[in-house]
Amino acid sequence: MAEDIEEIRRRKLMELQKKYLEQQKAQEEAERQQALIEAQIQAILRRILTPEARERLARVKLVKPELARQVELILVQLYQAGQITEKIDDAKMKKILAQIEARTRREFRIKW
């Protein structure tokens, strides 16, 4: 009887180890996919942004990461749709950031 309990414990432990390894592999694959996507986004941004515009976007990313991510994704989509034909300079980047910031800005009103 004690041997049966040990066998059950051993099987259960092996099952748990197997599940853990499968989860770990799935997580590693997801991280690898995310890194690949991020590398592709950065490659596209290097192609369409001047160094000054990339620098501005990097500074915005430090302060407002959500806004910077949104701008990156919009620029990539526009590039893939063929709507960006020339490099975006710092002045254009300022306009883009201002437009997107205005669109996503939330107003807070306090009523008494």
From Swiss-Prot:
GO MF annotation: an example: DNA binding
Keywords assigned: DNA-binding
GO cellular component terms attached to this protein's record: cytosol
Gene3D superfamilies for the chain: PDCD5-like
SUPFAM superfamilies per record: Double-stranded DNA-binding domain (SSF46950)
Superkingdom of this protein's organism: Archaea
Residue intervals passing through the bilayer: none
HAMAP family attached to this UniProt entry: dsDNA_bind (MF_00026)
Protein family: Belongs to the PDCD5 family.
Name this protein carries in UniProt: DNA-binding protein PF1087
